[in-house]
Regions:
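Feature 3881 marks metal-assisted phosphotransfer/nuclease machinery
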Residues: 1-112, 116-231, 239-340
Length: 340
């Protein structure tokens, strides 16, 4: 796939050089020396400078990077967004589960932090889990869940689910409905798909809004210790991941999208999610494919470029700003994508 240059620039951690055809990719947000840089020629890009020798092997000899997925993986590998040591145990454990003749979901429960930007998990699963194909979904979070469901269904055909297995997962709604603060992304996901997720996928859908942190972690610990269930905590909240790792011996998946603490999401990360959705899902609809809402940390309207988006609640003014940001997405990307 040849990706237009207008899309490649905002997808990763780059500076946009207006009026030129140059690009730079940095390893860290505050690095002075770019990881690599280059120029565009039509819809292709050429690397002409690599700042660090150890990353030179990541680039093709000819210097051309032909497609989005190829570039995405190289940038992720180079920038350290995915720690191989963190994934090795997960990949090995997951492989053992899917190769087991027994119905493995009786021992595994997924705990989803629904405020996470699930687009990033898609790349993780696609890269590290064999037999992983994307199935279209109208929600970014559900897109990943659907992938896992596909794997489960293929492995579990012909298997019988014991009654005690259903009893265990039937209790999820008690935990879920004790949440007093379901709104925004969580509410949209919950109220549109909760029955499907609970009954068909047997997935814990919990929020991480305030009290949700404790509910996820306590549920994670209880199931691991009392019910002998292995838990997979899917979150981009490093604090939750660290607490979960300290409190029980179960395994988990941790995926930090950024080094920004809490729910504050830099505008650059939001733009990255928007553009990734344009490719992955073939369309971008505000508050639908990507649920964006919240308060801006700066009051000056003209200073939005240096503000934050808080994924928490929504107002008309925030939606207007979101639509303004969305107007930057070239029209060619609407209704199209890598999988379209």
């Amino acid at each position: 796939m040849i990706v237009p240059k207008d899309l490649l620039i905002p997808i990763f951690n780059r500076e946009i050089f207006k009026g030129t055809d140059r690009f730079e990719v940095y390893e860290g947000w505050r690095d002075e020396i770019p990881l690599f840089s280059g120029t565009y020629s039509d819809c292709r890009m050429r690397v002409d400078s690599i700042g660090k020798q150890e990353y030179r092997s990541l680039m093709p000899e000819a210097g051309e990077i032909p497609g989005y997925l190829d570039l995405n993986q190289k940038v992720i590998q180079a920038s350290g967004m995915i720690d191989p040591d963190m994934l090795s145990g997960y990949r090995e454990r997951f492989g053992k589960i899917v190769d087991d003749d027994e119905p493995f979901r009786r021992n595994v429960r997924f705990y989803y932090d629904t405020n996470s930007l699930m687009n990033n998990y898609f790349f993780l699963f696609r890269e590290y889990i064999p037999d992983f194909t994307r199935r279209a979904s109208h929600n970014t979070s559900l897109g990943v869940v659907s992938e896992l469901e596909d794997i489960f269904d293929r492995k579990l055909k012909g298997h019988f689910f014991p009654d005690h297995f259903k009893d265990v997962y039937g209790k999820d709604d008690e935990i879920f409905h004790s949440q007093p603060n379901l709104y925004g992304r969580s509410a949209r996901l919950a109220y549109s798909e909760i029955e499907y997720l609970k009954k068909e996928l047997r997935v814990n859908i919990l929020t991480d809004d305030g009290v949700g942190d404790r509910i996820i972690l306590s549920s994670f610990a209880h199931d691991s210790q009392k019910l002998n269930l292995d838990g997979v905590l899917v979150t981009n909240d490093h604090i939750m991941a660290e607490r979960a790792g300290m409190r029980m011996g179960s395994w988990l998946v941790r995926f930090d999208l950024s080094n920004v603490k809490g729910l504050n999401t830099r505008l650059e990360y939001f733009m990255e999610a928007v553009y990734r959705a344009a490719i992955i899902y073939g369309r971008v609809r505000v508050n639908h494919d990507i649920v964006v809402s919240g308060l801006w940390s700066r009051k000056r309207q003209e200073d939005w470029n240096s503000g934050h988006i808080m994924v928490e609640g929504c107002s008309d003014r925030d939606l207007e700003r979101t639509l303004s940001i969305m107007s930057r997405v070239p029209e060619d990307f609407y209704g199209k994508g890598y999988y379209s």
